[in-house]
Amino acid sequence: MANKRRRKRKLKPLTKVLMVLIPCFVVVGVIYSIDSNKIQDNKIEETKTDTKINNDNIVKDSNTQDNNTSVDDSEVDPNDIYGILESIAKTDYRYKEVLANKDIYPEKLLEMLSRNKDMISYMYDFEDKKGHIYIDNIGKVTKGEYPLLLQYDKKWGYGIYGDNVIAINGCGPTSLAMVVAGLTGKNDTTPYDIAKYSYEKGYYTEEWGTKWDLMSIGIEPFGIIGKKIVLSKQNLYNELNNGHPLIASMRPGDFTTVGHFIVLTGIKDDKIIVNDPNSRERSAKLWEYDVIAPQIKGLWTYSLAS
């Protein structure tokens, strides 16, 4: 009996210890569980945040690509033309109006617009202004500098040249107008003036467009001399370095898929400066000789008539 009492006394301290320790383990377990949940929540939240950031970057990149779509004047399938225009029309009401009235435009103009957003202002006023010329000079001119003139400029681009408007057919006259301005320092010869003269003198045919003869003997009445030269890197660089602008007739390539005239105005960083009468974008670039030379099928150098 006495032994049983002693065992009970020994068990009491152990029971007290357990009564203290068990709640502690429970509390620690609860805290650990809470912390574990917090860690998991944080991991999930971090994953959501990372995913959101990546999606935002994708959207921004996509928008940047849409806003900087590079376009040119090459021939495309009519279905592609309208697909491009309809895509742009989603964010530009002017394109919607052009498409709604597409029957008033030559197919070539719609094609050009699909490759050159800079033309939208010209297109928007086409029906009202076709056939009209709105200026008799090209603006301020500095002798020795060659202004970039665009064949679709609203000041003369609605004028008729041959079987269509200067915006479509006028790359040759527009190129010559740049050369005349730079060599003479005068601003009173517009692309329309040269186009009108070219047509009246038989330098334009509906089948072939502007004849090469306009680039040489045809331009003499405007106070400059044009001479056809053999294409070589030495010839091209010598002429430009001596202050003689060049006009090039282009094969299909970066500038056209049919035929086109551009002006070569100088050399910078050993590259060629180009004035393309149908593209601000291409005119803003410097061109490697090895890129541009294979596309040239005719080349003329110019100087001021004595």
Question: What function would you assign to each model-found segment?
Answer:
Residues M1-L14:
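N-terminal Lys/Arg-rich, disordered targeting/topogenic segments
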Residues V27, I31-N37, D72-S87, E97, ...:
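Conserved active-site-adjacent core of cysteine acyl-enzyme catalytic domains
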Residues P13-L18, V27-Y203:
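Active-site-adjacent structural segments surrounding the nucleophilic cysteine of cysteine proteases
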